[in-house]
Amino acid sequence: MDKIIGKQLPKKDQDNEHWVSMSDLMAGLMMVFMFISIAYMHYVRIEKEKIKEVAVAYENAQLQIYNALDIEFAKDLQDWDAEIDKQTLEVRFKSPDVLFGLGSTELKPKFKLILDDFFPRYLKVLDNYQEHITEVRIEGHTSTDWTGTTNPDIAYFNNMALSQGRTRAVLQYVYDIKNIATHQQWVKSKFAAVGYSSAHPILDKTGKEDPNRSRRVTFKVVTNAELQIRKIIQE
């Protein structure tokens, strides 16, 4: 009879065969998960390396732009009462008495003379780094004060309109400088006039606002490093 229907394995042997099959299955799954983990870690490492490369390139470009600006304008900064921020790539004009009249958006004659000298040379420096530049912002900043009111909200929005009007006036003035005509298209595509009101005051050593230093105009280069990193993440 055993030869006809086959010999049935004892229950103990059946259980052993079952566990061997299960252990083989689990081992196979573990191998699959291990390969997935290795592949994912490899992918993450590659992405980190890409981001690191962009960060290094950003730092190099940032330093190169700063050095080029510093070499170009080092001898003029004191006369202009200006400074260049290495971290933000801002050329900061700090003397409000030279820039505009109180509550006015009209550029003072001395500021116009400074811009006549500064802006064509500024564009010449940036020419060498166009591939790294996303935007150039002309930023206007005010103090928190506003003559005629103690209401901080009214002062804020009045200063917002003032700072926006001033940066627009600066952009329009430099755009019309005769010897930058060949750069006008690039200026239109990259430059923005931004008024921040009193949102970014300059503080003194005690942590209080320095109203005089808070009133300023800056030219700020924004590089494309952040955009490149965002593209890597999205991919």
Swiss-Prot record:
One of its GO terms (cellular component) is plasma membrane. It is found in: Cell inner membrane. Residues 87-225 form the OmpA-like domain. Gene3D superfamilies: OmpA-like domain (3.30.1330.60). One of its GO terms (biological process) is defense response to virus. Keywords: Antiviral defense, Cell inner membrane, Cell membrane, Membrane, Transmembrane, Transmembrane helix. The keyword Transmembrane helix applies. Coiled coil: none annotated. InterPro entries: Bact_OuterMem_StrucFunc (IPR050330), OmpA-like (IPR006665), OmpA-like_sf (IPR036737), ZorB-like_t2 (IPR049653). It is a single-pass membrane protein. Belongs to the MotB family. Component of antiviral defense system Zorya type II, composed of ZorA, ZorB and ZorE. Expression of Zorya type II in E.coli (strain MG1655) confers resistance to phages SECphi7 and T7. While most T7 infected Zorya-containing cells undergo abortive infection, a minority produce viable phage progeny. These eventually accumulate to a high multiplicity of infection, leading to culture collapse by 170 minutes after initial infection. ZorA and ZorB probably assemble in the cell inner membrane and exert their effect there. PANTHER family: LIPOPROTEIN YIAD-RELATED, STATOR ELEMENT OF FLAGELLAR MOTOR COMPLEX. This is Zorya protein ZorB. It comes from Escherichia coli (strain ATCC 8739 / DSM 1576 / NBRC 3972 / NCIMB 8545 / WDCM 00012 / Crooks). The gene is zorB.
